[in-house]
């Protein structure tokens, strides 16, 4: 007799920013117990599936009691007696039948909330792995039909700007990727050493308080020029002795400083007395990136333009997409419909995989498979509001995404994922493969 679900219980817990989020426990007839919690983002794309919040004055409107109630009163009774190893069936049942809301980009989870559905989807996935007596990463690989497990290159967000930081920096994340490491363990060593070198460089140049950390564990020194951020990384990499082995990635989050009225980008958007003198066109911004790429070892640029600026995405991908990965986050929001459009229009060449943007494990797998078949790279990602849940570490290995960004090597909700990857690499032993320089295409499409 196959194990079946006997209970599904949701509760409100807190993320790393002190905001409420949803956690779900699933119990099965064979005694299996699994628990999962969902994250939430600060710079959210307008096309993301609905994250249901309560509104009102409690928790400044960010409570999730409605989402919790939706799990406990709508989803839970409907899942009792079902087989937790049937991931796609249960995800589709929740998304299409229990929720059933759609917009032009597909199933939008407006009724129950993507945070409610995803928490259950993640917990079911963990339960399925336990029932099958296999590691979670292997269960995910099996669900996707992937034969080759790969440890991802970590992209450590070590300098914060944009909506994540109180400084004047327009661009949101400056990352280091240890592509020259031979294993994930060595990648962690390189990342940590560059991080500590960066800390001392910043402290010396900007003073003690410049090494306070942001939401994702990176530093937010009060620098204004984006180029200065790149210069700091270059110096820290040199000081650590990893020039050529550690490269640079950026997440610009350009939607945050795009002006839809005059179609310009304002690199001075955080300045109180902003006179608009720093506003530039999409073409000018593209040239800024090209100059960065010619001067620094940049291998990845995420969200270089607004989430609706398909035109400049395509131009940039055509011009520098060979040497640099152009990653769609707000552009794609892990949505298979938007991924299909971007593939057709050659808008970018990599997917940022955030499970809570789409709201189920099955739809996330679909977006990854589509991306890989198009020859794209895939970067698994956390959100700025995280929990101690480590699901995305197993997800990155199981789907062989080749890359993961889950913050700096600082703050326990970030290290939880990196530490889980260390355990997975150890468990795989001689079979462990680190993506390294092949981070954009670590395996054949599946």
Curated annotation (Swiss-Prot):
Keywords: Cytoplasm, Glycolysis, Lyase, Magnesium, Metal-binding. Its EC number is 4.2.1.11. Pathway: Carbohydrate degradation; glycolysis; pyruvate from D-glyceraldehyde 3-phosphate: step 4/5. GO terms for cellular component: phosphopyruvate hydratase complex. Its cofactor is Mg(2+). Mg(2+) is required for catalysis and for stabilizing the dimer. Substrate binds at residues 164, 173, 302, 329, 381-384, 405. GO terms for biological process: glycolytic process. It catalyses: (2R)-2-phosphoglycerate = phosphoenolpyruvate + H2O. Mg(2+) binds at residues 251, 302, 329. PANTHER family: ENOLASE. Homodimer. Belongs to the enolase family. This is Enolase. It comes from Oryza sativa subsp. japonica (Rice).
């Amino acid at each position: 007799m196959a194990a079946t679900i006997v209970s599904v219980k949701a509760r409100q817990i807190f993320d790393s920013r002190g905001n409420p989020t949803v956690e779900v426990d699933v119990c099965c007839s064979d005694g299996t117990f699994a628990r999962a919690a969902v994250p939430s983002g600060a710079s959210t794309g307008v096309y993301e599936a609905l994250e249901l919040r309560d509104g009102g004055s409690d928790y400044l409107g960010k409570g999730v009691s409605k989402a919790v109630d939706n799990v406990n009163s709508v989803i839970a009774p409907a899942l009792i007696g079902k087989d937790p190893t049937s991931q796609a069936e249960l995800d589709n049942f929740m998304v299409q039948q229990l929720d059933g809301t759609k917009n032009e980009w597909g199933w939008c989870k407006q009724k129950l909330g993507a945070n409610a559905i995803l928490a259950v989807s993640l917990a079911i996935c963990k339960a399925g792995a336990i029932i099958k007596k296999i590691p979670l990463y292997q269960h995910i690989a099996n669900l996707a039909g992937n034969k080759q497990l790969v440890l991802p290159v970590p992209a450590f967000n070590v300098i914060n700007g944009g909506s994540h930081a109180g400084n004047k920096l327009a661009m949101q994340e400056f990352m280091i990727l240890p592509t020259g490491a031979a294993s994930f363990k060595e990648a962690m060593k390189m990342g940590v050493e560059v991080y500590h070198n960066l800390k001392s460089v910043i402290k010396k140049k900007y003073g003690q308080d410049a090494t306070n950390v942001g939401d994702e564990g990176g530093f937010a020194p009060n620098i204004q020029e984006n180029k200065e951020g790149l210069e700091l990384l270059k110096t820290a990499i040199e000081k650590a002795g990893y020039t050529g082995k550690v490269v640079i990635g950026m997440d610009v989050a350009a939607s945050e400083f795009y002006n839809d009225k005059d179609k310009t980008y304002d690199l001075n958007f955080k300045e109180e007395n902003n006179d608009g003198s720093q506003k530039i066109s999409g073409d000018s911004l593209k040239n800024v990136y090209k100059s960065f790429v010619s001067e620094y070892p940049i291998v990845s640029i995420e969200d270089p333009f607004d989430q609706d600026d398909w035109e400049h995405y395509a131009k940039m991908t055509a011009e520098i997409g060979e040497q640099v990965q152009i990653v769609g986050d707000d552009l794609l929001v892990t949505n298979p419909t938007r991924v299909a459009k971007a593939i057709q229009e050659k808008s970018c060449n990599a997917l940022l995989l955030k499970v809570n943007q789409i709201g189920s494990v099955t739809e996330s797998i679909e977006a990854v498979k589509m991306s890989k078949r198009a020859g794209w790279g895939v970067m698994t990602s956390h959100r700025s509001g995280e929990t101690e849940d480590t699901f995305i570490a197993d997800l990155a290995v199981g789907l062989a995404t080749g890359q993961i960004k889950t913050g700096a090597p600082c703050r326990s909700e970030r290290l939880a994922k990196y530490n889980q990857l260390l355990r997975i690499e150890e468990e795989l032993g001689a079979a462990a493969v680190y993506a390294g320089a092949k981070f954009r295409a670590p395996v054949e499409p599946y």
